[in-house]
Each structure stands twice: as C-alpha cells, then as structure tokens.
Design a protein with these regions (language model features):
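N-terminal accessory/pre-domain segments preceding catalytic cores
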Residues: 1-83, 109, 130, 183-215
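Hydrophobic/aromatic-rich core segments of domains that either
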Residues: 72-88, 97-107, 112-113, 118-203, ...
Length: 215
C-alpha cells in the first residue's frame, strides 16, 4: 500500500521539523535544498515499517557524539563527523564475527546474525541521518571479477565531493577495493533521475527514424 494512503500528517510534520533542525546544524548547513531532500529529509531508508525512529535513535547515539560539535576539526566537517561516528559503530561491533551488535535498537540490530553489506548500509544510514550527517547509499549490482553485488555509503562533504565508506567497518575513502573490478556504480535516490530517464528515451529514439517512410 502506498504511503500516501496510510501516513498521517502529524508524522510527516514531525519528521520535516526534525530534519530542518539538522539542515541548520553543523554538518548539514552546506547542503542545497535538493541535497537536503535526498540525505536528511527522508523518513524511510527502504520499505521498512513506519516508525518514529528519530525519537528512538537519538537517545542511543546523540550523547555519544555530542562532543564532536565542540571540536573545530569535527564541528563543520561531515567527513570527520562521519569518520568519528563510524568508528564508534565499528568499535561497538564484536570484531570476531562482525555480525553481533551491542546496540539494541530494532532498526539497526534486528537479525544481526544474518547481516550483509545491505543491512550495514541501512543501519548506518539511519544513524547518520538522525545525527544530521549527509550520507547516500551507493551500490554496484555486479562486480567485474566475482559474482557478487555490493552496497556502501558515501558521505557528502561541504566541498561537494562524495567519499565512500563501509558502515560499521571502514572510514571514508576506504570502502572500495579496485581489485574487485567495479564496473558501474548506482546511487539510491528518492527523486526521479530525470537525466537518466532522458538518456534512455534519447537512446530508444535514436533507433527509429524521425520521419518513418510510408509505403
């Protein structure tokens, strides 16, 4: 069922208000409106059940990283904030298996024993979004030299560059292994990719004559 048929106005208003506070925060104030809509505003990561996750995640993580906003090196750098938060997540993981998490929040620790890169990516997306750190989800559907897909996150820096990282594991710029032969990278988006659609339409039209001959 579509969200528009079940979601309540109060839920959307609450989500928007909290997202705007993060946009005004130290790690989000550099974002354009479109970037804000893609990274901090969304109330979902995928098709998971609706919940007031901003309220339930904040007590779990905000006290842990409040000190970041008081240090110049971290205060206005999404890159440094991302590094620090992901280090906290990494250290809170039992390293022997990298699958059991101390965090008890259901959105980021449910069925942890079955986690793969997708669950790590979704978990860190929730945490970063709740803290106001602008992060995307990127993926490759197929490696060039092995039979696997892979998902990872990318933090959007104030310079405009995106730096990839693996949630609960590596810091920015240490996520992609060039030896895996990444062929093509896609980015999860909440808005329609009009440029991509126009390229497809243009490519399809190029296979047909503009003025078909009629016999």
């Amino acid at each position: 069922m579509e969200d528009i048929k079940i979601i309540k106005a109060d839920y959307l208003i609450d989500n928007i208000d909290k997202a705007f506070l993060h946009w005004e925060g130290p790690w989000g104030k550099h974002l354009t409106f479109d970037e804000f809509c893609e990274t901090l505003l969304p109330y979902r990561v995928d098709i998971e059940p609706l919940s007031h996750w901003r309220d339930s995640l904040s007590p779990e993580f905000s006290p842990t990283i409040d000190w970041l906003s008081h240090i110049d090196e971290y205060a206005y750098s999404p890159y440094q904030a991302c590094q620090a938060v992901n280090d906290i997540l990494y250290k809170s993981t039992v390293y022997a298996n990298q699958i059991f998490h101390k965090f008890r929040h259901p959105l980021i620790a449910r069925n942890a024993k079955d986690w793969n890169c997708v669950q790590y990516v979704y978990g860190v997306q929730y945490v970063m979004r709740d803290l106001g750190v602008p992060v995307h989800i990127d993926y490759t559907p197929q490696y060039g030299v092995r039979g696997n897909r892979h998902y990872w996150n990318s933090v959007l820096h104030y310079t405009g560059h995106s730096y990839p990282f693996q949630g609960y594991n590596s810091g920015p710029e240490r996520s992609l292994d060039p030896h895996n032969g990444t062929i093509k990278v896609f980015r999860r988006s909440y808005a329609r990719n009009r440029r991509w659609i126009s390229e497809i339409v243009k490519d399809e039209q190029s296979h047909f004559p503009i003025e078909p001959l009629v016999e």
